[in-house]
Amino acid sequence: MKPPILFTILLTVISGTMIVLMSSHWLMIWIGFEMNTLAIIPILMKKSNPRAIEASTKYFLTQATASMILMMGITINLMYSGQWTMSKTLCPMASTMMTIALAMKLGLAPFHFWVPEVTQGVHMSSGLILLTWQKIAPLLVLYQISPTIDPNLLLPMAMMSVLIGGWGGLNQTQLRKILAYSSIAHMGWMATITLYNPTMMLLNLTIYIIMTLTTFMLFMHNSTTTTLSLSQTWNKTPLVTSLILMLMLSLGGLPPLSGFIPKWMIIQELTKNEMIIMPTLLAITALLNLYFYMRLTYTTTLTMFPSTNNMKMKWKFDNTKKMILLPPLTVISTMLLPITPLLSILD
């Protein structure tokens, strides 16, 4: 893809999200979602091969269905309220339909089936955009309508997402699929806390985006796509491989890394709201995510695959990929836990 065309498409993707963020008119929000969806398709098909085309088609059909349900919810709300403006009060049917549409866009269970397949079928850079930037607009619309959402609808979806995000990643060897299932689990955590402390959801989203962005950038730096290729990078770039594994543990929520902050604060907030069963189940299912990340770290560091090259001297070319943002992003993704007391302002 030529640079001017790529720049125009990326600008349209960014513009679509910004329109959603800055609008209080439901029609403009819907138009922003449509701009974003139509512009991301060429990015997903950047590497023209059958798998990328299949993934783009799956993504388009899912997002088009979600947009149709969202427009139906907007129309029903217009019939009841007589206004297009986003307000704190929505009729129950419109709120339910909008919640389902946003859950489809986010990949919450049981609408999660497209996330691993699409992420695996596209290029690593396209997967990065898919799992980070594309989550911002739906989550912030969910944030704005959170007072009207029925907890009996959103909480079961959130709980299923955390559970499926943990189970799905257990038998994966493809790194993109592992990150996709991790994304489903993180969306479940964010959906849970949206009902009780929406501001904390924004903190969770920020930390998730930083960790996922850094992980994808390190994968692209090392050109790794599977657990086998990751284990073979010790001889080439031992420092980068160590950072990748540390980031994996942070994504799993292992203390004292940054990924532990949102889980800690969400469980604390749910407990303050006199909920016992939900935080207990979330903490138990979060162990599934932590398990497959720790297993990946263990197999990469303490065991050797048969095809791993153990030579002390190895032909090595200088890496021409210069990523200036990697050092600060890596520090933020792993060492934010000491600032947690400062976040008491969210209470």
Curated annotation (Swiss-Prot):
Family per similarity comment: Belongs to the complex I subunit 2 family.
Subunit structure: Core subunit of respiratory chain NADH dehydrogenase (Complex I) which is composed of 45 different subunits. Interacts with TMEM242.
Enzyme Commission identifier(s): 7.1.1.2
Keywords, comma-separated and alphabetical: Electron transport, Membrane, Mitochondrion, Mitochondrion inner membrane, NAD, Respiratory chain, Translocase, Transmembrane, Transmembrane helix, Transport, Ubiquinone
GO BP, one annotated term: mitochondrial electron transport, NADH to ubiquinone
Leader peptide range in chain numbering: none
Catalytic activity reported: a ubiquinone + NADH + 5 H(+)(in) = a ubiquinol + NAD(+) + 4 H(+)(out)
Pfam families: NADH_dehy_S2_C, Proton_antipo_M
GO molecular function: NADH dehydrogenase (ubiquinone) activity
Compartments where located: Mitochondrion inner membrane
Listed name of the protein: NADH-ubiquinone oxidoreductase chain 2
GO cellular component: mitochondrial inner membrane
Function field: Core subunit of the mitochondrial membrane respiratory chain NADH dehydrogenase (Complex I) that is believed to belong to the minimal assembly required for catalysis. Complex I functions in the transfer of electrons from NADH to the respiratory chain. The immediate electron acceptor for the enzyme is believed to be ubiquinone.
Membrane disposition: Multi-pass membrane protein
